[in-house]
Amino acid sequence: MAILYTSEIRDMTPAEREAELEELRTELLNSKAVKAAGGAPDNPGRISELRKTIARIKTVQREEGDLADDE
């Protein structure tokens, strides 16, 4: 999964953003599991990049009204 820029995220449809968000969350979960198990991740900086990309997607969703207030 590639790291996305804000302009790329804004060009996506709400459904595409939601699908991308789920993929990134799954990848982040797997990366954190490897780290917690004591393994060395392939790219240690990837975890922070995943977190930032997830935040970017959620920010755009909030701006465009795609994200409910309770999330």
Curated annotation (Swiss-Prot):
GO terms for cellular component: cytosolic large ribosomal subunit. Keywords: Ribonucleoprotein, Ribosomal protein. The keyword Cell cycle does not apply. One of its GO terms (molecular function) is structural constituent of ribosome. PROSITE patterns: RIBOSOMAL_L29. The keyword Repeat does not apply. It comes from the Archaea. InterPro entries: Ribosomal_protein_uL29, Ribosomal_uL29, Ribosomal_uL29_CS, Ribosomal_uL29_sf. GO terms for biological process: translation. It holds the Pfam family Ribosomal_L29. Belongs to the universal ribosomal protein uL29 family. This is Large ribosomal subunit protein uL29. It comes from Halobacterium salinarum (strain ATCC 700922 / JCM 11081 / NRC-1).
